[in-house]
UniProtKB/Swiss-Prot annotation:
Protein name as catalogued: Alginate biosynthesis protein AlgX
Pfam families, A to Z: ALGX, CBM_26
Protein's gene: algX
Residues covered by region (CBM domain): 348-476
Positions of the catalytic residues: 174, 176, 269
Main location: periplasm
Subunit structure: Monomer.
Organism listed in the record: Pseudomonas syringae pv. tomato (strain ATCC BAA-871 / DC3000)
C-alpha cells in the first residue's frame, strides 16, 4: 500500500472527510455557488396601480413604494416635490392670520417636512434617484417663506432633513412621526416661539421629559399594503415619553388644564398624546401648553372645535401653534368660512337679520325664508349663518342655500368622528368667485334618516365679523 494512503487511513474519519471536502472545494473554485437575497416584503403589483386606491381614505396613500426593510413611502405625499396652494388659498391664509392678529393672537405654523425629505436614504437606489430631493427641499423652504411673509411665525424645520440620528424621525410604515421626531421638532419650534412678542410675559416653569413605556405602531401604510396585497408587517415598537413639571410629578396637570395656559396647540394627530409633542414643547419653551389636538382631526378639526369653545372665546391665547403637514390642501373654502365665523363666536350675541327654529323630519326641510316678514338685504359678502342642533352629537350638516336669482349652493360640513361636538355649525355665506353679491332667499336642511327621531334645530343669520381685510396675494405676486 502506498505510504500516503496508509497515512490517510490512519486519520480519523472526520478529518479525512474534512480534507476530502476541502479538496473538492479547491477543485470547484471556478464554479462556486451564488446566492441572491430577496426583499422580505415586496409589494404586489396591485399596490403600484393608482386605480386600486378607490376610497377617499385609500387615495391618501397613492401609490405605495417599497423601500429598505419594512419602510414604505407614498409617491404623491412622501415623495412630493411641490409645496404650494392656489391664489385663493393664499388669500384665505392671509385673512385668517390678520383676523387672529386683530384679536391679539400670534399664530405659529408648524409645517412638517415630508417623510421623503427626512428619510430619503431609506429608499432603494432606483427610487432615490427618481426623487428630486434638491427641488423638494427648495420648494419646501419657499413655502415656509410664503407663510412668513403672510405674517405667521414659521420655524424652519429643513435642518431635520439632514440629520443622522440613532432613532427614526418617522415610523417605517406610518405617516406619523415618532416621539423622537416630535422631540426634535419641538426643540426647533420652541426657539421660534421664544421670539414671539408676548412670550416674555407668559408665566414660566420648568418641565422634564422621561421615557414612560413602549408603544407598538401598526402603521397605516403597512395596513394599506395589507388591504391591497394581503401582506403583513411586523409591529414597530418605540419609546413613549411623559413630560411633567419639575418637582411636581404625578400632579395630573401636564397640559395646564387646572390653570389658564397662554399658549395653545392645535393640529393633526401628530400632536396627539401618543407622540408627546405638546410635552416636549413645554419642556423646551418652559411654559404651559393647552393641547386641544385629537386623533383624526385633520387640518381643521381641532382648530374649529377650539374656536367654538368657551376657552377660546373668553380666554384667547397669546400664542397659537398650528401643526399640519403638506398633505392638506390650503384652499378648502368651506374650512375658512367656518374659521372666520367662529373666530368671533358666530352669531352669538349679535342681532339676528333672520332666524327660526323648527323640527327636522327626513328629507329636505325649509328652515329660513327671506320674505315672510318683508324682503331683507342679505348679501353673501356681509352675512353668516349659525345653526345649532339640540342633539349635540350631530356631526354632519347637509344644507341647500337658495338665492334670489334661482341659483343655489349645496353645502356639506362633516366633523371628525373623533371630535367632541356641540351640535353647532357656523359659517360665512359664500363669497368666492362671483358669490359675494348673491342675495339669500332660503335655507333648507337635510333631516334625519327615515325611522329615526326628529331633530330640533335653530338657525340664525347675522352680520359677519369684521376683521382687517387682507391684501390680495397669489403664489407669484406678493409672496
Amino acid at each position: 500500500m502506498h505510504a500516503h494512503l496508509i497515512k490517510l487511513l490512519s486519520l480519523s474519519s472526520l478529518t479525512a472527510a474534512l480534507m476530502a471536502a476541502a479538496g473538492v472545494a479547491r477543485a470547484d473554485d471556478a464554479q462556486a455557488p451564488t446566492f441572491k437575497a430577496e426583499p422580505c416584503c415586496s409589494l404586489c403589483p396591485a399596490a403600484h396601480d393608482a386605480k386600486n386606491y378607490t376610497t377617499r381614505y385609500q387615495q391618501n396613500f397613492t401609490t405605495l413604494v417599497q423601500a429598505q426593510g419594512d419602510w414604505l413611502f407614498r409617491t404623491q405625499e412622501d415623495l412630493r416635490t411641490e409645496f404650494d396652494t392656489t391664489p385663493g388659498g393664499y388669500r384665505r391664509m392671509k385673512e385668517l392670520h390678520d383676523a387672529f392678529k386683530s384679536k391679539g393672537v400670534e399664530l405659529v405654523v408648524v409645517y412638517q417636512p415630508t417623510r421623503g425629505l427626512v428619510d430619503r436614504n431609506k429608499l432603494f437606489p432606483a427610487e432615490r434617484d427618481k426623487f428630486d430631493y434638491d427641488k423638494a427641499l427648495k420648494n419646501y423652504q419657499a413655502m415656509l417663506g410664503r407663510f412668513s411673509k403672510m405674517g405667521y411665525w414659521v420655524p424652519d424645520l429643513s435642518p431635520l432633513t439632514n440629520e443622522q440620528q440613532a432613532h427614526d424621525f418617522y415610523f417605517r410604515g406610518d405617516q406619523h412621526w415618532t416621539p423622537y421626531g416630535a422631540q426634535r421638532t419641538a426643540k426647533i419650534v420652541a426657539e421660534t416661539v421664544k421670539k414671539v412678542p408676548g412670550y416674555s410675559s407668559i408665566p414660566k416653569r420648568e418641565f422634564e421629559s422621561h421615557i414612560s413605556g413602549r408603544m407598538g405602531k401598526t402603521g397605516t401604510l403597512h395596513n394599506m399594503a395589507g388591504q391591497l396585497c394581503g401582506t403583513s408587517y411586523a409591529v414597530q415598537y418605540m419609546d413613549q415619553f411623559t413630560t411633567e413639571p419639575k418637582g411636581e410629578a404625578g400632579d395630573g396637570d401636564l397640559f395646564g388644564d387646572a390653570g389658564n395656559p397662554e399658549i395653545t396647540l392645535v393640529g393633526t394627530s401628530h400632536s396627539g398624546k401618543n407622540y408627546n409633542f405638546a410635552g416636549f414643547l413645554q419642556e423646551y419653551m418652559g411654559a404651559d401648553v393647552l393641547n386641544v389636538a385629537f386623533p383624526g382631526g385633520g387640518l381643521e378639526g381641532s382648530m374649529l372645535q377650539y374656536l367654538g369653545s368657551e376657552d377660546f372665546q373668553k380666554r384667547p391665547p397669546k400664542i397659537l401653534i398650528w401643526e399640519f403637514s403638506p398633505l392638506y390642501r390650503l384652499d378648502q373654502e368651506t374650512i375658512y368660512r367656518q374659521m372666520m365665523a367662529l373666530l368671533d363666536n358666530g352669531c352669538e350675541g349679535k342681532p339676528a337679520v333672520m332666524s327660526a327654529s323648527t323640527t327636522l323630519k327626513p328629507g329636505n326641510n325649509e328652515v329660513l325664508v327671506n320674505g315672510k316678514n318683508g324682503i331683507k338685504d342679505i348679501r353673501n359678502g356681509s352675512n353668516q349663518i349659525d345653526i345649532r342642533f339640540d342633539d349635540t352629537s350631530v356631526k354632519t350638516l347637509q344644507a341647500r342655500l337658495w338665492y334670489m336669482n334661482g341659483r343655489h349652493e349645496d353645502l356639506k360640513i362633516e366633523k371628525p368622528e373623533t371630535s367632541d361636538t356641540d351640535g353647532r355649525f357656523a359659517f360665512e355665506l359664500r363669497e368666492d368667485e362671483d358669490w359675494a353679491d348673491q342675495q339669500l332667499l332660503a335655507l333648507e336642511i337635510q333631516g334625519p334618516e327615515a325611522g329615526t327621531a326628529p331633530q330640533k334645530v335653530a338657525a340664525k343669520v347675522c352680520k359677519r365679523n369684521v376683521f382687517p381685510s387682507a391684501a390680495k396675494h397669489t403664489a407669484q405676486a406678493g409672496l
